[in-house]
């Protein structure tokens, strides 16, 4: 991955803990079973880039010669994928973590809290190369990134009887990131396949959707004329088309009106599992969800012309006499390819992720089969999935990750995602 002197990296770590519940000043606090404070610091490295990015690569190619005779001979040609950079080295992340482990009331309640902050230096990113090089980009150690957040886990024994028990395990996490430095750059702009633009700016989250705000649609040509706006962009003033907001109030609709219209990072991830046991029966279910975060839904640009799909065509503008809801553009509005908040949607969801039901045979029965245990079970996944109001896609977890979308500087684009499948499974666990 890296050249001489950079092939190996050193990534140390240190951790420590203090069990407060064993100290004398807490020895008489009977309701605390365990109380531990933890702290750690560690450094990790990343070298996950293309092979030999530090070398100028040659590839086999045919060389034609002979004054147009068509005679060719095998030869070599330099790579046109990326420019070499012999100076690239390991990306490193240093993380500080503080945690608390608490068990109380005869271990019926357990709480784990972790707070962390990390800084990634020498980010391995692809940077645009100058045009005279003949290649579009090269790998470089460019800038630094900060992540910070928390994770909380709660475990409770709600009922603990001889024949019946009920336990709950819940967790919630929050993370936010911020670009601290981008080398000599204040920001970078990266473009997807459908002209949508992603901005990477110092002080902002790693990826921000950079596009146009809209205010419904142009209801008629008269509506456009009365606005008094002008534009150098094509297909901006079309009856039934999206009404772009003049963000900078200069009377012109152009690229300077682009602004922050969302990012892909959720506010919270959460999950909760309840488990019940009664005799030989067991039953559990997992609810899981995401709150916040936006997604660029590329499907409307593909499906808006398919008039049989109600989700994309209900209340659509048809004519000045049939304007629909005044917010949904007409079906041949090609400039919807430009990134606008019309296709930026809430990626929040709530799901009944998994349900398990089982029955374990008593020992006196399993002995007859000469096995140590036998359990029959039934599992159902994704029985219920509720997306945020206004989301028009099929799977808020789906992301496009081919081509330019494989870059860490581009995130949150969705197109053609498969629906979330419901899975039913039945089986037997046998231990001999």
Predicted regions, residues:
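Transmembrane beta-strands of outer-membrane beta-barrel pores
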Residues: 1, 20, 41-45, 115-121, ...
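Structural signature of Gram-negative outer-membrane beta-barrels, strongest in the C-terminal barrel
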Residues: 1-60, 91-104, 116-118, 147-148, ...
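Residues on the lipid-exposed face of transmembrane beta-strands in outer-membrane beta-barrel proteins
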Residues: 14-20, 39, 98-102, 113, ...
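Short loop/turn motifs that connect adjacent beta-strands in outer-membrane beta-barrel proteins
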Residues: 21-35, 48, 105-108, 159-166, ...
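Solvent-exposed loop/turn elements at secondary-structure boundaries
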Residues: 27-91, 110-145, 202
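C-terminal beta-signal and terminal closure region of outer-membrane beta-barrel proteins
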Residues: 66, 142-147, 192-219, 324, ...
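Conserved small-residue
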Residues: 140, 157-264, 381-383, 388-391
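Extracytoplasmic gating/loop element in the C-terminal half of outer-membrane beta-barrel translocons
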Residues: 231, 290-383, 393, 402
């Amino acid at each position: 991955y890296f050249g001489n002197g950079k092939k190996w990296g050193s990534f140390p770590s240190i951790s420590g803990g203090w069990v407060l519940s064993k100290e004398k000043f807490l020895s008489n606090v009977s309701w605390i079973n365990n109380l531990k404070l933890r702290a750690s610091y560690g450094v990790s490295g990343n070298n996950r880039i293309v092979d030999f990015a530090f070398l100028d690569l040659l590839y086999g190619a045919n060389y034609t010669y002979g004054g147009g005779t068509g005679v060719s001979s095998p030869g070599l040609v330099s790579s046109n994928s990326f420019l070499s950079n012999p100076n690239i080295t390991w990306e490193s992340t240093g993380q500080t973590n503080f945690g608390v482990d608490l068990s109380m009331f005869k271990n019926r309640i357990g709480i784990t809290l972790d707070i962390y902050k990390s800084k990634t230096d020498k980010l391995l990113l692809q940077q645009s190369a100058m045009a005279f090089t003949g290649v579009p980009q090269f790998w470089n150690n460019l800038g630094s990134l900060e992540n910070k957040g928390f994770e909380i886990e709660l475990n409770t024994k709600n009922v603990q009887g001889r024949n019946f028990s009920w336990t709950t395990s819940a967790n919630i996490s929050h993370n936010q990131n911020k670009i601290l430095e981008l080398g000599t750059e204040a920001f970078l702009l990266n473009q997807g396949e459908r002209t949508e633009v992603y901005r990477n700016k110092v002080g902002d989250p790693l990826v921000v959707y950079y596009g146009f705000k809209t205010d419904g649609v142009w209801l008629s040509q008269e509506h456009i004329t009365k606005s008094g706006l002008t534009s150098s962009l094509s297909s901006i003033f079309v009856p039934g088309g999206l009404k772009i907001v003049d963000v900078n109030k200069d009377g012109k609709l152009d690229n300077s009106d682009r602004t922050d219209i969302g990012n892909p990072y959720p506010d919270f991830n959460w999950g909760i599992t309840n488990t019940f046991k009664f005799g030989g029966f067991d039953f559990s279910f997992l609810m899981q969800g995401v709150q916040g975060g936006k997604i660029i839904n590329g499907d409307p640009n593909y499906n808006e012309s398919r008039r049989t799909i109600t989700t994309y065509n209900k209340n659509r503008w048809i004519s000045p006499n049939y304007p629909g809801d005044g917010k949904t553009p007409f079906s041949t509005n090609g400039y919807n390819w430009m990134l606008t908040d019309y296709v930026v949607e809430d990626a929040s969801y709530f799901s009944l992720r998994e349900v398990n039901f089982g029955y374990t045979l008593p020992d006196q029965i399993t002995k007859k089969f000469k096995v140590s245990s036998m359990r029959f079970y039934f599992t159902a996944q994704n029985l219920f999935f509720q997306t945020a109001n206004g989301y028009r896609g099929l799977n808020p977890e789906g992301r496009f990750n081919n081509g330019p979308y494989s870059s860490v500087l581009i995130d949150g684009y969705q197109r053609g995602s498969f629906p979330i499948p419901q899975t039913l499974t039945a089986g037997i666990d046998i231990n001999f």
